[in-house]
Amino acid sequence: MFSRFARAFPKILASGASQRTFATVQKAFANPTSKKLIVGSSLLIGSAFATTSFVACENKSVPLVGLPGTNQERSFIAIKVSSTQRRLIGEIIARFEKKGFKLVGIKILVPTPEHAAKHYEDLNKKPFFNGLVKFFSSGAVVAMVFEGKDVVRTGRVLIGATDPSQSAPGTIRFDLCIETGRNIIHGSDSNESAAHEIALWFKEDEIANWVSTNPVYEKM
């Protein structure tokens, strides 16, 4: 049934009904009170199109920073300004979801220089630190938490080397970076870093502890 819907979807988009729907959404963005609802609805609809099953129930037993070494291990991933400016958000999220990792937290914000400095505090002695903070706080960043078995290590493999020119073909940085100094994405490099970064960017009530009805890692 889903495949039939997927084939029909382009026709639906081309129809007058879809145009009226998108026009309504466009008007709604003019109303500040509608923005949060529309952003949430867009994320929900995108996930529904991308998967054949959805949320079953809430799993309240997982702490904010996850459980390293288990199926509920968590990693912090940030899509940087250079990616949001190039409209690569969906492409990057898809890489993690196709690998079977579960998105449990997401927000879009422009970090303050203070927040950016705290995020990169382990690099504060480096000569490039001030430039890094300035760039990271210069525009919209998509902050995310992904959950799954070995997500920290595997996430780093998906991302590629810090220097995009040294990244392997097929990694996010090799495929999508166009400038070495702007490597488009950040990912936790250890369970300790993940715990620190998740707590820095997210509160308990901003994480959705949901359980998939078609689990990949839930029972492993």
Swiss-Prot record:
Transit peptide residues according to the UniProt entry: 1-57
Catalyzed reactions per annotation: a 2'-deoxyribonucleoside 5'-diphosphate + ATP = a 2'-deoxyribonucleoside 5'-triphosphate + ADP; a ribonucleoside 5'-diphosphate + ATP = a ribonucleoside 5'-triphosphate + ADP
GO cellular component: a single term: mitochondrion
Positions of ATP binding: 80, 128, 156, 162, 173, 183
Keyword Secreted belongs to the record: no
Name of the protein in question: Nucleoside diphosphate kinase, mitochondrial
Domain of life: Eukaryota
Keyword field: ATP-binding, Kinase, Magnesium, Metal-binding, Mitochondrion, Nucleotide metabolism, Nucleotide-binding, Phosphoprotein, Transferase, Transit peptide
